[in-house]
Regions:
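Bacterial N-terminal signal peptides that target proteins for export
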Residues: 1-10
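Transmembrane beta-barrel domains of Gram-negative outer membranes and organellar outer membranes
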Residues: 24-306
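C-terminal segment of classical bacterial N-terminal signal peptides
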Residues: 14-23
């Protein structure tokens, strides 16, 4: 077993022996609803379907063309606190061959749901399965395993003197990416080698929930559809820390807005490169997200084992 798989297995083993959290459907902690986010993963376990998520951006560099990615993401609770998921993406390029990227698998365990303090904590493992995508779109032949800590905190427990800050919430992720191969020979004749670094994966989302403002702070008379909107901004970064790539951070900043109903959520965000290494062009992404635990509460939207 590789070191990265040992890390992932150990992390899940620790989670499974901890006391159960009082998990609730799709991201509630007390009165706080945490929306599904696109660039950073959610700090909760739920039955949900993102279909589709469509992003578009013009790639930087010589001959850079338009890239349109269309993905599907499914999460399923096995127990009230433990869930599995998978995701797949079709990558379309305006000036290059198109195809599927690598399959992505995930497991997540809910460690904490603190209703009075509107806090969530979860631990999980994500894996990009090498060799499952098309070579023509540059899908890696090696896998990458990323043990991750997920957290969320609403500001509803602030004093009433700060009531206008109560609708604020933050969610985030802290993870380490471990490729199963340290390097790949890209040209057998010349012996050129591409090195695959371990990475520090960080994400943060800052949200202001207008529905929370209306229902739990003060009704200011917002009409539909604004009374269910959640303005937000996401930050997602990847920082290599060995094999000659130390500190070469890449990432994006994604400002946008989500609209959350009872059964689904619609989100639109800009994709802004965080630095020159991340690109020079601004793109966009939209996502339609379904709450399967509310749509099918007695069948496919409930945990397999109660």
């Amino acid at each position: 077993m590789t070191r990265s798989l040992v890390w992932g297995a150990s992390l899940l083993a620790i989670a499974l022996v901890l006391p159960n959290a009082s998990a609730l459907a799709h991201g509630f902690a007390g009165q706080r609803f945490f929306p599904a986010t696109i660039a950073t993963d959610d700090p909760f376990v739920s039955d949900e379907l993102s279909a589709p998520t469509v992003s578009t951006i013009r790639n930087s560099g010589e001959g850079g063309g338009q890239e349109i990615d269309t993905s599907i993401d499914v999460s399923k609770r096995i127990t009230p606190n433990f869930g599995l998921g998978f995701a797949e993406t079709w990558q379309h390029f305006s000036n290059a061959p198109s195809g599927f990227g690598n399959l992505e698998l995930s497991a997540k365990y809910q460690l904490l749901v603190d209703a009075p303090h509107e806090a969530l904590l979860a631990v999980g493992v994500d894996a990009e399965v090498g060799g499952t995508g098309a070579r023509k779109v540059g899908a890696d032949r090696f896998s990458t395993v990323t043990p991750t800590l997920f957290f969320g905190k609403g500001m509803g427990d602030l004093p009433d003197s700060m009531k206008w800050l109560k609708p604020l919430a933050v969610t985030g992720t802290l993870g380490f990416g471990f490729p199963t191969r340290a390097s790949t020979v890209t040209d057998p004749d010349s012996g050129d080698v591409e090195r695959h670094s371990n990475t520090f994966e960080t994400g943060l989302a800052i949200e202001y929930n207008l529905q929370y403002l209306q229902s739990s702070v003060q009704d200011i008379g917002l009409p539909a559809p604004f009374n269910r909107m959640i303005p937000l901004v996401e930050f997602a970064f990847s920082t290599p820390f060995n094999r000659g790539q130390n500190g070469l951070t890449t990432g994006t900043i994604n400002p946008g807005v989500a609209w959350a109903g009872r059964y689904f959520q619609l989100t639109a965000e800009a994709i802004i490169p965080a630095n020159n290494r991340s690109g020079r062009n601004v793109g966009g992404v939209v996502q339609l997200h379904f709450f399967l635990d509310d749509i099918f509460p007695t069948t496919i939207g409930r945990p397999i084992f109660q």
